[in-house]
Amino acid sequence: MRWREFGALAALLALAATAATSADLVGAAEAGDSAAVRAQIDSGANVNAADSGGTTALHWAAHLGDVSMAEALVTAGADVNARNAYGVRPISLACSSGSGKLVKLLLEAGAEAEASRSGGETALMTAARTGNLEAVEALLAHGADPNASERNAQTALMWASAEGHEPVVKALIAAGADLRATLDSGFNPLFFAVREGRADVARTLLAAGYDVNEALQRRTRPQYQHADSGMSPLILAIENGHYELAVALLEAGADPNDERTGYTPLHTITWVRKPKNSDYGSDPAPEGSGNLSSLQFVQTLVAMGADVNRRLANGHSIAPKINVQGATPFLFAADKADVPLMKTLLDLGADPLLPNVEGTTPLMAAAGLGTTAPLEEAGTEQEAYQATKLLLSLGADIHAVDSNGETVMHGAAYGSFPTVIQLLAESGADPELWKQPNKHGWTPLFIAEGYRPGNFKPAPLVIATLEQLMVAEGISTEGPRPRHIGTYEKARLARQQVRIDPRTR
């Protein structure tokens, strides 16, 4: 009986020792200790033992890219297709680590070339993203599908293009990767390469048959920041600040006056240099790539055929108070109070006096017309002052009135720019314009008092500046004010189906 108990105890101790040894094996592999791993193998450790997450020693060797450790484990019988708790196999980790030799070792030991992670990411996609050509070629040679897609329909070619791995892109194309694979967002490998500024990859894809003037076409409504339908590779490159790539696209035949998004490349550069408003003022311009500045690119763009005075046929509004139809790149630059760009365009032959279809002039835009959120939009008061001063020096009509009844003084009131108001007064603005109501019944003073779209507080400094100038000219600041209904009140009344007087909109 005692011998039986002793035998059972010995068996339990041996089992415990084996378990401890196996745990030590996984720990040694995680620590990257190849010598300890070999010692554990020699002592009889279970090479397929896994930790609580299902990770084996071979997983760790693959993750670390340790070829010699992996070779020792494979020779000892490690399962090359073992999955951890997340469904990840060693070969996927080897592709992530970028070790082509390790990928080849695992494939030759029987690893599945079509192995994928949760979500459908194949080993080939992973290798394409990390850019290891040896790994990609080994996977393709063992039957990996170059056109497999993950749950978002992205392919290995898209990933390699986005990451800029030109040799991998060439290998995938040679293996039959589908050049026309396109996401619902409209993005294909070329658009991915252009967005990320991968000039070499873009050239390779164009040589493989892409049209440099093809238009992006979205099939679904985007949930996040998106590229517009009709956008060309050239416009996409400009919007992301990749000016050297944009020049390469122009050299490949891109249309310098492409207007399919509603805006030409020259119009587009205005908001790339000074992006749209945010809660903290103007957002920074994109970092982009290359050594070509935005102004140097503008010069090159015009030299390559861009029409510096191109007037837009149409296009969705970028500022609720300015109609973009008929607007020139210079008017857009004035709207941003971007004096360096304005001067560059002038040197290239821009007409500083051309208005849009409603008669809104660059001077009005520079002074602030179109501003819907003062202090949150591109163009500071000082920049608006300098832009206004420049246009006045060029002979811009300070007394012009557009078809909405707006004047340059209305613009300064919208922008809440008292120094611009003072400049206009000193430059001879007709005092009668200071009491000129627009089509909504708003004078510059009324706008400063808060009679404008949305819920605005009065601008005391602007009011004081206008009142002082008006009183000095003998113009009354008194009189009836238009009925003002704020945004939230309008919504409430709309729900009650109450007709709102158009003059209050």
Q: PLM features: residue spans?
A:
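Ankyrin-repeat-protein effector appendages
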Residues: 19-27, 142, 208, 225, ...
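Conserved ankyrin/ankyrin-like repeat signature
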Residues: 36, 68-69, 101-102, 134-135, ...
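Ankyrin repeat domain, specifically the short helix-to-loop turn at the C-terminus of the second helix
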Residues: 41-45, 71-79, 104-112, 137-145, ...
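Ankyrin repeat boundary/linker residues
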Residues: 51, 84, 117, 150, ...
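Start-of-repeat signature of ankyrin repeats
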Residues: 54, 87, 120, 153, ...
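Ankyrin repeat A-helix N-terminal signature
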Residues: 27-31, 60-66, 93-99, 126-132, ...
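N-terminal segments that cap or nucleate solenoid repeat domains
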Residues: 20-60
